[in-house]
């Protein structure tokens, strides 16, 4: 497993490979998947957190089933840009995954992704109970969509035939 920049991931992905977005919480791991063209992020059901070995296996099972080529994981920076305790927990999770998979990870600044996801669910008139169930995967979609938009921009600047 390798931690890459988004630019490095862009260089390693083959056309038609999907990537997954992760929003690592204390109780759940929010999941989202890109389409094969890597244009759209779609929320997927969360993984309920237990202990690391169980969480890791559930994530690896998801990755195998969905043929994931890499992960974009939200890095919960403080608003001032400093790293808080959740950043440390996220980095520790990725370090621990190093022993479990060769799939690459990209850290993505997730500031305000949960706020944006909550606002979107409110605008869709989703009930409070349903919002609680869906917020982490919606946040994972916001994280992944940001990375997909960056990948699209990189592809256009490189003259890639698959760019929008």
Curated annotation (Swiss-Prot):
Intracellular or extracellular location(s): Cytoplasm
Pfam families per the UniProt record, alphabetical: RuvX
- InterPro entries in alphabetical order: RNaseH-like_sf, YqgF, YqgF/RNaseH-like_dom, YqgF/RNaseH-like_dom_sf
- Which GO terms fall under molecular function for this chain's record? nuclease activity
> Any idea of its EC number?
3.1.-.-
What GO biological process terms are annotated to this protein in UniProt?
rRNA 5'-end processing
Family statement drawn from the similarity comment of this UniProt entry = Belongs to the YqgF nuclease family.
Protein name as catalogued: Putative pre-16S rRNA nuclease
Please name the source species.
Answer: Rhizobium etli (strain CIAT 652)
């Amino acid at each position: 497993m390798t931690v890459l920049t988004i630019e490095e991931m862009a260089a390693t992905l083959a056309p038609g490979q999907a990537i997954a977005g992760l929003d690592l919480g204390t109780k759940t791991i929010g999941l989202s998947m890109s389409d094969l063209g890597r244009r759209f992020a779609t929320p997927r059901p969360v993984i309920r957190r237990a202990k690391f070995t169980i969480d890791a296996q559930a994530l690896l099972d998801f990755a195998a089933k969905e043929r994931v080529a890499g992960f974009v994981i939200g890095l919960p920076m403080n608003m001032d840009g400093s790293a808080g305790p959740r950043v440390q927990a996220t980095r520790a999770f990725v370090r621990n995954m190093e022993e479990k998979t060769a799939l690459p990870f990209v850290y993505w600044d997730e500031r305000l992704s949960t706020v944006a996801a909550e606002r979107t669910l409110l605008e869709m008139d989703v009930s409070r109970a349903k919002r609680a169930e869906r917020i982490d995967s919606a946040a994972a979609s916001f994280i992944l969509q940001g990375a997909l938009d960056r990948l699209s921009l990189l592809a256009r600047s490189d003259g890639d035939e698959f760019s929008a």
